[in-house]
C-alpha cells in the first residue's frame, strides 16, 4: 500500500531503489522519487538472466537486480514511466481501441452467421451495420442477431463519445498534436497517441531512435559472415505501432496523398516478393514515426515533397 511504502522508505536518506516493471511500478516510482530516492525500473527484456533462470523467486530476483544495479545501472535498460495525468489520457485511447475490437468481432460474427444461411448483407461500413433494417437479415437468425445489433449500436455510440473526448484533448490540452496531423493520413487518434506515448520529444537525441523505440526496426542476430534477415522487434507500445501501420496502409492506398513517404513505399512495392507489401508498409510506418517526431521536435511545417524538390534543385544546371 502507498502509506506503508511511504512510512518504510522515509527512514532512509537518498538511496537507489530498483524494481521490476509491473502493474504497480507506474505509481511506485513517482511515490519513492517524491521522497528523494533514485528509482530505476528494470526492463525484463534486457535481463534474460532474471526471467530465464532455473531458480527463480522474489528473493533471488531482488538480489540479482541489486547486483546489476551496483555494477552498471544501464544494464537494467531502465524504463521511463509516463506521468499519472498522461496515463489517464492514454486510458481514453485504450478504451476506444478495446471498443473498436469488440465492434469488429461482433460485425464479423453477424456477417458470418448470415453467410452460413446462404444470404449476404449489402455492402456498408462497419459503423453502419447496426443501422441495417432487421428485415434484411434471414428470418431464422433475427432472434439471435437482434441483441447483437443493439449492442453494436451502443458500442458505436461509445466510440463516437471517445472520439469527441479525443478531439477535445487535442484542441484544449495537447495543441502540439496539430504538428503530426499535418501529414495526410494521420488523424487525432494517432497524433494524440504519438504525443502521449513519447510524452516529450527531447527524450530522443535523434528522430531515428523513435523507430527502434516503437519496435519498427528489424531484429539483429549476426555472427561472423552470417547476418540473416529477421522480423521487426515489436518492442514498445503496441497500440501506437498498430496505428502507425494503419496510417502507412492509408498512405500507400488509393486515397494517399502524393508525398516522399508514398513514393518511397511505392518503390519498395515494385521490388515484389512474397513479403514485399509487408516490408513496404513497415518501412513507411517507421519513416512516418521518424517524420512525426521531427515535426514535433522542430515545430516545422510539413512539406510532402521536400526531399523530391531538393533532388530536383540539385540536378538543375547552375546559371
Residue ranges and their predicted role:
Residues 1-319:
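A detector of single, family-specific signature residues
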